[in-house]
Amino acid sequence: MESKQASGNHEDVSKDKGSASRTKAIGIVTAADSRERRYGQLHIYDGEGKGKSQAALGVVLRTIGLGICEKKRTRVLLLRFLKGPGRSYDEDAAIEALQQGFPHLIDQVRTGRADFFTAEQATKFDISEAKRGWDIAKGAIASALYSVVVLDELNPVLDLGLLSLDDVVKTLRSRPDGMEIIVTGRAAPPSLIKIAELHSEMRAHRALDIKDSSQNLLNLSGGIEIYTGEGKGKSTSALGKALQAIGRGISQDKSHRVLILQWLKGGSGYTE
């Protein structure tokens, strides 16, 4: 993910005096050169709306692209809390394909169980799995091996009281220079938001004529989704959605094909 807001740069057709007109540049270049971007930020995606984990997957895709196209030292850890192996996700097959093709660029760890539970229903297994995941995260952060560490669904783990918030805040605050950390999930604690360089809240705005229940809405496939607002994570959410669709095409042997059409992105600073 670009951690620096890209800005539009208009360059009109120019003319040389005494000679035929020639095109200097056409269009709008919005991509910030990778050398100008600020790395090492803490990003938090929370809120009731969809797109939090999708945005993290988009960051994964972009970071892998950075390692491929620019041959920079980059490696991603995708650490997923509350998403144990007992449940499959659309993006699983796509991530496995990326791991097979570029094993030096991405590692994935899944912890916990996939079932929904409240703080009162938490078991010793839930606590031990949260601790296992956090121990891996702390080791990864201390090692400085990774350029990006994604802590998917860490916010709900903290909300459930499965980990020490003080320990998490202390560890994330002391991360190595240049290491980007992405934290996702609902109910981000204020003390974590306070130390973040970026906090995007996802809110759902559903069409008024949809009469289906919210649970059924979550299970719908197809349709139109629009990501808008001042916060970052819109394009990365769309990229994450594309990665999920590719995963479905691989695992379910269906004719899934994705078209990624990007406007106002004619520069060379995009790595996805």
Report the location of each language-model feature:
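Short gly/ser/thr-rich secondary-structure transition/capping motifs
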Residues: 25-28, 130-135, 181-184
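Structural motif
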Residues: 44, 148-150, 182, 226
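Short beta-strands and strand-loop turn motifs
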Residues: 149-154, 260-262
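Extreme N-terminal, non-catalytic leader segments
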Residues: 2-41, 214-223
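Short His-Asn-centered micro-motif
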Residues: 47, 152, 184-186, 229
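General beta-strand structural signal in soluble alpha/beta enzymes
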Residues: 108-110, 151, 183
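Conserved P-loop
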Residues: 40-142, 223-272
